[in-house]
Regions:
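Amphipathic alpha-helical segments that line or abut small-molecule/effector binding pockets
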Residues: 52-67, 120, 124, 145-149
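Amphipathic alpha-helical segments used for helix-helix packing
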Residues: 66-91
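Alpha-helical structural segments
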Residues: 7, 24-46, 57-61, 96-100
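Residue-level recognition of oxygen-bearing side chains
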Residues: 21-24, 50, 71
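Amphipathic alpha-helical packing segments from all-alpha helical-bundle domains
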Residues: 35-38, 83-113, 117-124
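Helix-turn-helix
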Residues: 1-24, 28
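Amphipathic C-terminal alpha-helical segment
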Residues: 64-68, 104, 108, 124-143, ...
Length: 160
């Protein structure tokens, strides 16, 4: 809390007045990050609604959020147990917002059209894979987003 107060330019007493404990502060940070990443994804899809690139747009918005907000990702490294629990807790709400954005594009995927997966299951799988990059970072978020969007689950295997 001392470091946070110093970084914010406020006294520890003021910080404790608003947040009480480190856990309350972390929860407030997590809630803000959850809201902002959801908004970033929704805004990215609104700016580029083409279904042909929808998966890449969603994944890239997630990755770029991390790049644009490195302090949010620092919390993941400083408090990994809290971060894992927070992501686990937030994932259902994130999925509820983002799945409807992905489903129209995923309905065109060969794995969905063949009946191997539902569009909702494929959306959840993609979002879970993308979420792991918050713990195993990449120096090339754009390339990673393109790699995930190019999965055979979405486009079929080279032999199909």
């Amino acid at each position: 809390m001392r470091e946070v107060a110093a970084a914010a330019g406020i006294s520890r007493a003021t910080l404790y007045e608003y947040f009480g404990t480190k856990q309350v502060l972390l929860r407030a940070i997590a809630t803000r990050v959850e809201d902002e990443i959801q908004s970033a994804v929704v805004d990215a899809v609104a700016a580029q609604p083409d279904l042909a690139v929808r998966v890449e747009v969603v994944i890239l918005a997630m990755f770029r959020f991390g790049t644009a907000h490195p302090d949010a990702l620092k919390v993941l490294n400083v408090e990994p147990e809290f971060s894992i629990n927070s992501i686990h807790h937030a994932f259902p709400a994130f999925l509820e917002v983002v799945e409807p954005l992905l489903v129209p594009a995923l309905e065109l995927a060969p794995s969905v059209q063949s009946g191997a997966m539902s569009p909702g299951a494929l959306a959840e799988l993609l979002l879970r894979v993308a979420a792991t990059t918050f713990f195993v970072s990449t120096d090339d978020p754009d390339g990673m987003a393109r790699s995930i969007a190019a999965w055979p689950l979405l486009h079929g295997s080279p032999s199909s």
